[in-house]
């Protein structure tokens, strides 16, 4: 992938700020790119684009349905709209406009949805978004991406500009740590990335779950000899089904991890692939259960719903026939700083 737009400092910028930087650099290079938001330029980090390319930045006010209607019109006029708002507003409040105005016409419109999953923890259920992947992947023509970190956000945004049709990219609030060491690891929309090889069990994760899965795999390998294959399934639709089929053949045990409801998201997509393959596979889905999410810091909520490192370790241990309780040695390893482990 071209490094032309990778001008950010991964150590100094949050993942969401990286999105804003990359989008601005792309806008300077491509006159057809426009950015739209609904009074959330500061929160979605599109303020830099607004400052440096004001003639191609459009703030429609707090009117998300109009936001996507306007974006569809601009796409029809030959522009390349990047639309930024909170995931909950894009996928729920404006779902009809995205479905009918954008997806039905298969318009070249890119949606960057921030504050997804449980990342806006203290704001509570009204601002959490654990349903967006389920909604968006049900729309015909829509591509759905859940990047793991700042590097992958940059790669996804850059790749989406040349990827035909509607694209939905969900990112967090912007405080997530990095899992990749650099941007040049062979990112491609629709192609999973294997981060860790293993023969006992496979963990397929997206978004914030990827770092936790990688940490869990390393801890279990070093402390208990459990070999875990970790797959970064950044693209939820189109899904890399071959990667799943290979994992079934290699381990026969799969755990999915997502900062999303277990209904309709990554876990459901993987389950559908397994069911249609006719292959035997032990599957467990980790995510938010069939309930509305609670209120708390994102880290607390991830722990509560067992989508943190400890929760993944427990699920892996149980699946391979060991006690799900995390022993003292493993707890010590959990306290280590595993930033940039890949």
Predicted regions: what is each one?
Residues 1-170, 175, 186, 329-342, ...:
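Thiamine diphosphate
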